[in-house]
């Protein structure tokens, strides 16, 4: 779409082995700058990334630390609207937002991992992860549309001072021991997680007329406005403390059992307003068991089954009412297989039951009572010949809101993909060639919680060609990628009849990579 991208990746040791605190220290530094014209009516995307990492290890201890910083700006595109209850391909490129509608901010992530081996049987592992996204959103919101005349009512909204963060710390003891003549892989540990979502100034402008989607004139709606005191300073915070015990037991050469128990204590508070008013202050604890069996029917075929329970506090900054935590149960059974020469795959059937599932309509998040997903999944990957490799998947999913007996929004009953890569050399031309391509299938989906319209299914085709050679002393790679090769118009998701996402058109990129 008229853009450019530059990347670098530097990796190497810092000192000789054993010189740094008796161990080996290495670094990696990656960076990227990407800017492009937005593919719809107007707008521009920009991303600047820098990511340093350090790794140190000796005979018994390893330490890994990585950090990533991203400065980004992107159009706040709410997609298209329904015209007489249908999706109109003529509006594929046409936006109803103003040019100032965009989201800009800074994303940061930090990850650390420390592991120490006491013996061949026992080791301890500690991890810490932190992520934060600070951003502002300027939004053109569609509030009503007249399909006959094209008149679109809009408002100028904004969410300023957004600050969403998540941090998680774990500490665990891992052991591989023999007890009662059976091999055990044991894990005992603890976990702490904190999630926080905050929205500062909340601006909700008045709905205004004067814009026609069929003959748009931009610049009639100004950004900004006065913050709504009652809706500003929205905050939701969750603290969760967990203790985990798990054991994988090799009962016989063919039979393996896995059992685990997690106890989680959680605290949640949320509210909004100036002055701040608490809407929810709740706490509780939950036991989450899991159990599984795997049996090797043959060296190439293994049957398995497992059952587990799940728990997740719901965090959102704009809610209709305090959000209760989500509880779930998963039942799964299947077969893992391997075929010659080097093909592996998994066939699984499952049922997932959840209650208090968070759904968002417009910008407002609430929960539905109970949801159930039943399905079949098949994944296959491997080397067909010396030159040809493939990866494919298919899933049948029957997902419903059990209270209303309606399909879940944006969940397709049929999805699948198939991609192949051919790796070869061409006579009289030094280097290697790789050619690949494939397709993704997504079936029809419900477009909103009321099931008032359906998003059509689609097939999207991608392809690439790559050439690897050496120029001078430097390994060099040229790669041409084409996404949505057939330039198919498709709609990946929707939120309402006024917010329907539009898939990107054909995108061609040429990348050159030089290693030194």
Which residues fall in each region the model found?
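Transmembrane beta-barrel wall of Gram-negative outer-membrane proteins
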Residues: 2-77, 100-120
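Membrane-embedded beta-barrel scaffold of Gram-negative outer-membrane proteins
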Residues: 7, 12, 115-129, 133-139, ...
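Short loop/turn motifs that connect adjacent beta-strands in outer-membrane beta-barrel proteins
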Residues: 15-25, 59-60, 119-121, 178-186, ...
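Structural signature of Gram-negative outer-membrane beta-barrels, strongest in the C-terminal barrel
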Residues: 51, 55-57, 164, 183-195, ...
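Surface-exposed loop/turn segments flanking beta-strands in extracellular/periplasmic regions
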Residues: 81-94, 145-154, 200-232, 279-281, ...
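Face-selective signature of the C-terminal outer-membrane beta-barrel domain
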Residues: 110-133, 156-271
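Conserved C-terminal beta-signal and adjacent last beta-strands/turns
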Residues: 162, 186, 331, 409-516
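Gram-negative outer-membrane beta-barrel transporters
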Residues: 351-353, 366-448
